[in-house]
């Protein structure tokens, strides 16, 4: 007996015969030339449309849309599948691996089509989950595409499920080209699979009204031939018009060339320093030997967009200054192309559109760098899985540089290079950590965007801002030192705040003298392998360290207890007055308490299994 089918969208409980089948099979989907709506447990569709969209694969076969309910702590997903397919998988994993992934599966055995919550083991073998936390709401076939609507709680407390938080999520997908007789017959190693990064839980921020005099400026790299390599960072230098008067940027958004939505991964606009009247023009790969060195001084972030992000609006009371004689006219656009299928011949003119106004807002928004100084004094040994480095914006600096009323941080962009895995900035006051400014426990250096904070953070005089980065150097044989090079490392949080102050950089590094004492200790217990002579550079010294457990532990202890050099810098790159060397680490006696995840109340269900809803031969 067939379940009820309809060519019109509807929301109803499954028929009794389906419920009986559910105890044996679980949930399944009609896929061939029918429209099926199956509502489970009286589920309702999301009232508002899906505001967020991303292509999952470069060919455009899979497109994901989603809608977030913070009240119910549930995400509704809509997955569009183009063309006739034997099935798809979609899910999440810690770093984008297909192994140990939390999955939802749609597959056919050649006769029936099934939908089920599943997971993959460390060998990529797929298994049915004992808790079916992905709930199918609707399946609809239109022309040559299939649309699946399903939902899942943020937190399920199922050990096989991924905890969805407001940091980066590594989405995985796969396309099944042939039937499988059972779910257990599927292994991810034999599928066409891929990875996409996104922030699923975006803060609910109201959209300010645009003023009548708003204007736009497009920063686009013209007619780029996208390289057929997997990863390309493209740099383009442009300039503002001569005598461009002072304006406020109040919003920006991405402009992505049609057809390239799956290839343009993220983009940033940087303002160059004002040290020179002119910067050389350039339009090419950022790692090109032809790229002028001066482009490294174009690193003041004006705008940053990543796949899945919508337009970025500044608070009504603040805007980012653009123009005037006191700032550089030169801007650098950086576009990250992600081309895992090595597609050739694709042209692109993507970029970022700035919305600006001559009606200056009450406050100018500033950008402050927190974290570590770009210096080889801070290093990560090779073969490390979770090595942590921490930079401090000390109470002495905030006391001297911030206004009495404090500042309000409303957005943040975390940044490391290739080995960064986690980043967090915490505000401390009176020796106690008070709140997290921003955190990403699944950070990826290939997915960077300016993110609005759920709640603005007020920083007062005397507060401490602590930024920690966790690195993984398992695949490296030499120490990774801090610096500007892509194979060197950084630990930075660009915080966006108002009102703008003279303080542009508040960072730290270990004291150089204490680092040299570390090298002397290594020599004392290691037969003089590290040169401590004046002509040896710090990178050379780190390259000579034999990385046994003693030397690793000693370096960790050095970074955790040794005095620091604080860079409390003005916009002119000059430090605020005072002696900033040999400063003690801030004395923090308590950490921020982490809330325990709230587990949903589970409804009593029958044995988990793929629930057959319809066979291919059913009438419709």
From Swiss-Prot:
Its EC number is 1.14.17.1. It catalyses: dopamine + 2 L-ascorbate + O2 = (R)-noradrenaline + 2 monodehydro-L-ascorbate radical + H2O. Proteolytic cleavage after the membrane-anchor leads to the release of the soluble form. Binds 2 copper ions per subunit. Residues 41-620 are intragranular. The modification Phosphoserine is found at residue 349. The keyword Glycoprotein applies. Coiled coil: none annotated. Glycans are attached at residues 67, 187, 274, 475, 569, 587. Cu(2+) A binds at residues 265-266, 336. Belongs to the copper type II ascorbate-dependent monooxygenase family. Catalyzes the hydroxylation of dopamine to noradrenaline (also known as norepinephrine), and is thus vital for regulation of these neurotransmitters. This is Dopamine beta-hydroxylase. It comes from Rattus norvegicus. The lineage of its organism: Eukaryota, Metazoa, Chordata, Craniata, Vertebrata.
């Amino acid at each position: 007996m067939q379940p009820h089918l309809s060519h019109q969208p509807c929301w109803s409980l499954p028929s009794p015969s389906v419920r009986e089948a559910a105890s044996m099979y679980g949930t399944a989907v009609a896929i061939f030339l029918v429209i099926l709506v199956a509502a489970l447990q009286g589920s309702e569709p999301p009232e508002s449309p899906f505001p967020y969209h991303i292509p999952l694969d470069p060919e455009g076969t899979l497109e994901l849309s989603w809608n977030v309910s913070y009240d119910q702590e549930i995400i509704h997903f809509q997955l569009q599948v183009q063309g006739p397919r034997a099935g798809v998988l979609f899910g999440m994993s810690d770093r984008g691996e297909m192994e140990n992934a939390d999955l939802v599966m749609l597959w056919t055995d050649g006769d029936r089509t099934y939908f089920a919550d599943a997971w993959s083991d460390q060998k990529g073998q797929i298994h049915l989950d004992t808790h079916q936390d992905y709930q199918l709401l609707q399946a609809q076939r239109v022309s040559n595409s299939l649309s699946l609507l399903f939902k899942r709680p943020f937190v399920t407390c199922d050990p096989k499920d991924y905890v969805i938080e407001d940091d980066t999520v590594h989405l995985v997908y796969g396309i099944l080209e042939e039937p499988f007789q059972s779910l257990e017959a599927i292994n991810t190693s034999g599928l066409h699979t891929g990875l996409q990064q996104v922030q699923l839980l975006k803060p609910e921020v109201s959209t300010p009204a645009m003023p009548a005099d708003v204007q736009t400026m497009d920063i686009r790299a013209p007619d780029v031939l996208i390289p057929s390599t997997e990863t390309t960072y493209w740099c383009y230098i442009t300039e503002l018009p001569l005598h461009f008067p002072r304006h406020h940027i109040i919003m920006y958004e991405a402009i992505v060339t049609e057809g390239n939505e799956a290839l343009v991964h993220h983009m940033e606009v940087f303002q160059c320093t004002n040290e020179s009247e002119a910067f050389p023009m350039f339009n090419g790969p950022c790692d090109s030997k032809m790229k002028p060195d001066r482009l490294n001084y174009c690193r003041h972030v004006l705008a940053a967009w990543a796949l899945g992000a919508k337009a970025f609006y500044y608070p009504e009371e603040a805007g980012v200054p653009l123009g005037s004689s006191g700032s550089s006219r030169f801007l650098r656009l950086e576009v990250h192309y992600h081309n895992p299928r090595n597609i050739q011949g694709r042209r692109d003119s993507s970029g970022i559109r700035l919305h600006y106004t001559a009606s200056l807002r009450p406050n100018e928004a500033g950008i402050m760098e927190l974290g570590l100084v770009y210096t080889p004094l801070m290093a990560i040994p090779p073969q490390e899985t979770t090595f942590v480095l921490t930079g401090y914006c000390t109470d002495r600096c905030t006391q001297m540089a911030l206004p009495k009323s404090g500042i309000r941080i409303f957005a943040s962009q975390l940044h490391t290079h290739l080995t960064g895995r986690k980043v967090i900035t915490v505000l401390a006051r009176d020796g106690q950590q008070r709140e997290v400014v921003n955190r990403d426990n699944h950070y990826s250096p290939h997915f960077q965007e300016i993110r609005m904070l759920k709640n603005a953070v007020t920083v007062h005089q005397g507060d401490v801002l602590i930024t920690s980065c966790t690195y993984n150097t398992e695949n490296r044989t030499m120490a990774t030192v801090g610096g500007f090079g892509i194979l060197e490392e950084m630990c930075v949080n660009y915080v966006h705040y108002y009102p703008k102050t003279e303080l542009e950089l508040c960072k730290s590094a270990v004291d150089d003298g204490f680092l040299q004492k570390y090298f002397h200790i290594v020599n004392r217990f290691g037969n003089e392998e590290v040169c401590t002579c004046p002509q040896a550079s710090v990178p050379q010294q780190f390259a000579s360290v034999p990385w046994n457990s003693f030397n690793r532990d000693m370096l960790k202890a050095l970074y955790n207890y040794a005095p620091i050099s604080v860079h409390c810098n003005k916009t002119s790159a000059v430090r605020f007055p005072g002696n900033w060397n040999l400063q003690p680490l801030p004395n923090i006696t308590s950490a921020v308490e982490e809330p325990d995840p709230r587990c949903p109340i589970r409804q009593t269900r029958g044995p988990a299994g793929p629930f057959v809803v319809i066979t291919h031969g059913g009438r419709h």
